[in-house]
From Swiss-Prot:
An example molecular function term from Gene Ontology annotations: ATP binding
Family according to the record: Belongs to the thymidylate kinase family.
Protein name (record): Probable thymidylate kinase
EC number: 2.7.4.9
Alphabetic keyword roster: ATP-binding, Kinase, Nucleotide biosynthesis, Nucleotide-binding, Transferase
Length: 199
């Protein structure tokens, strides 16, 4: 049976790079949020600095996820899926803006629970160095990234978490490690959790 694996972490943790590498190694379909659909493109514009109420942005993310989940369920019939970000990003990023957790959970109620979540951690200063060459998005400020990092750990440690993955969470620290080192750690941890994932 095909598996749905999600990569999460603060900006600059190496998540997109590793998600793509793992997808390739597992012969999985790579996907991401926000998606490249119409709603996802609107979200990207807002993240680049367009004005928008925080609740509106939360609802847009949830609407984009409706489309994404539909595609994930279809694609899971054919292969494993690896997603760069998912509902956990909405929970921690939007809570960092003061949106109540219950509101975020309610609007994401339909979200499919993944089999496994890989959380990549990184020292905040190293994350900022990695992001220096990128265009800045509204969430890419050190105070916000610190809040988001704390939010991820709070989410992982909470009991009866609504979106608790079937095989739980894997946490990998990417600080001062090469791309290959991190990749090997992630792959070994995934195989340890789901031994039959590699055919």
């Amino acid at each position: 049976m095909n598996k749905f694996i999600v990569f999460e972490g603060i900006d600059g943790c190496g998540k997109t790079t590793q998600a793509k590498l793992i997808a390739e190694r597992l012969n999985a379909k790579f996907t991401f949020e926000p998606t490249d659909g119409k709603i996802g493109k609107s979200i990207r514009e807002i993240l680049s600095g367009s004005k928008c109420q925080k609740e509106t942005l939360a609802l847009l993310f949830a609407a984009d996820r409706v489309e994404h989940v539909s595609k994930i369920e279809e694609d899971l019939k054919k292969s494993h899926i690896v997603s760069d970000r998912y509902v956990y990003s909405s929970i921690v990023y939007q809570m960092s803006q003061g949106i109540p957790k219950d509101f975020i959970y309610t609007i994401n109620d339909y979200a499919k629970t993944p089999d496994l979540v890989v959380l990549l951690d990184v020292d905040l200063n190293e994350a900022l160095k990695r992001m220096e060459s990128r265009e800045k998005e509204i969430f890419e400020k050190i105070e916000i990234q610190k809040k988001i990092k704390e939010g991820y750990y709070s989410l992982i440690n909470s009991e009866n978490e609504k979106f608790m993955p079937t095989y739980g969470f894997i946490i990998i620290d990417t600080t001062s490690k090469s791309i290959n080192q991190v990749f090997d750690e992630i792959l070994n941890a995934i195989i340890d959790k789901i031994p039959d994932i590699i055919q």
